[in-house]
Amino acid sequence: RLSLVGSEMCIRDSSNTTVYLEGGAVLKGCLTCDSVENVKILGHGMLLEPQQGISIAYSRNVLIDGITVVNSRHYTVSGGQSTGITIKNLKSFSYQGWSDGLDFMSCSDVLIDDVFLRNSDDCIALYTHRWNYYGDCRNVRVFNSTLWADIAHPINIGTHGNTETGDEVLEDIVFKNIDILEHDEDDRDYQGCMTINVGDHNLAQNITFEDIRVEHIQEGQLFHLRVMYNQKYNTGPGRGVKNIIFRNISCIGKYINSSLIEGYDKNRKIENILFENIVLNGRRITSLEELNIDKKDFVEKIRIK
């Protein structure tokens, strides 16, 4: 059914519905899945300059396949407190501030495969509580994709959570076979091609980055692991980061700021991090010094293989 959101026409999907955008079709509007299940959004058509491309809230079993989103003012796809989201063969291009690619808040059982994201903010971001969404973020798989961040992060995990309950977790997350084409961010607090920066009493654990190729960093960091209290976005520090694997990572960038690993205090630390087969400019890394990491306090059990 159709509804008016501001000055924009929006299609609101019902349960057990397929929306098909035929190749050559251009929709100047958005698609919304709110409290529905078993929805498919298919085809090779385009969403052109929506305020937000596709919104999925309080829903389950939503498939997006083949769509192109051009110049979304905000998220290309956002997920909130939803499960069973699958996104395949999606292309996204955006140029304005805050125009993230795929952001998921308190979502579980998410599969992203074969997407191309060229965004002027985070390409992929995973959070727990934000806005009116509550709960953990777990079992997220991102495969065979290309990320190009004009600004901010190609991959961002953490940041937002729930300090009132203090028990939300981001876990069982895999990024595999990913090409990162660009990372350009002036502010060091928001740098990192692969970033885990937990705040708001979040805990991030059991996360793997594997077979990641970074082609260029105009300004930024390769890795950014941090338990933080960002006064702009958080109401408390994160709980910790642990059991993280970086395997088969290569980067050919020559102008890279030092990566960062930093805990918050003795009870909110970073621990058990593995760097395996990391290759920078053709040279396999054998030490933290060669990896160019600024290792600060409250960090334990860092291994290089």
Give short role names for the model-derived ranges.
Residues L21-E22, L42, N197:
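Short His-Asn-centered micro-motif
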Residues R12-S14, D34-S35, A57-Y58:
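Flexible, charged surface loops at secondary-structure boundaries
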Residues R1-G6, I11:
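Single conserved hydrophobic/aromatic residue that forms the stacking wall/gate
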Residues G6-E8, N16, E22, K28, ...:
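Surface-exposed or flexible loop/turn and strand-edge residues in extracellular/cell-surface modules
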Residues D184-K305:
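Extracellular beta-rich repeat passengers
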